[in-house]
From Swiss-Prot:
Residues 253-288 are annotated as: Disordered. This is Cell division protein DivIB. HAMAP family: DivIB. Residues 264-288 have a biased composition (Acidic residues). It is a single-pass type II membrane protein. GO terms for biological process: FtsZ-dependent cytokinesis. It is found in: Cell membrane.
Amino acid sequence: MEKVIDITERVPAMKKRRRRRTNFKFLALVTIFLFIIIILLYFQLPYSDIKKIDIKGAALKEDTYYIDQSNLKINDSLWGFKISEVEQAIAQHEWVKSVTVERKFLNEVQITVEEWQKVAYISQDGEFYPMLDNGIVFEESNEIVPIDAPIFRDFENEALRKKLLKELANLKPEVLSLISQINANPTEADPYSITLFMNDGYEVRADANTLAEKLNYYPSIIAQIESEDVSEKGIVDIEVGSYYRPFSDEYTLIKENTEKTEEPAEETENADTEEGGQLEEQNEEEPE
């Protein structure tokens, strides 16, 4: 037979459970209230103001430039701006590839800028302007001859320049650092013909369309040349295949071609001189 529990025995337990439930609700309400008070105080007091603006990834421009472009200032409200608007203000510059703005901790803003890579310089009016891998010429110049990237000379063709910039961006960093100067020497047969002058003393003839594909093998090509005890530096031609000839052979060939070109001109000049002399003799023999 089941035991019958008197209601008077259950009352204390019920009161205890009710008291616990009431205390829990009270604590929850107090916690929420305190949390709201803290948030209100945070927004009202200087703790929610910007105390630091951190710029990461800037190379072409100073950190202060990007801070000015963001329109953010120290002691502005950390929550008083839209992230998308700040990102748009910085990303509108053609040398900026991407930008990310983040609120850090309780009073910091971090702006991460990814710029287009500088791959070369172009010489204009005695100054050197950085060229980026998206094809643009950066607005700020340098009067000092740069050593951190190759220099473009005689690149009047914009299509050729942009094509070459893309190829340089695909080069291995260790190969790109070996290039000192690049000259454009287009012809009707090959409008993309270029000449590269390397820091190690060699000269490379190449086609801009296939430069990255072939020039990435440059270190191994030079290693093979020097392993054959070649005592003279020269020209590495990778326009079609890949072959090497010393500078002395190249200059001898140029000299011979120049002499062959000059010989017909000299013969013509001599013939004209002889013909002129014969005419003078005939004029002297004619009676007055």
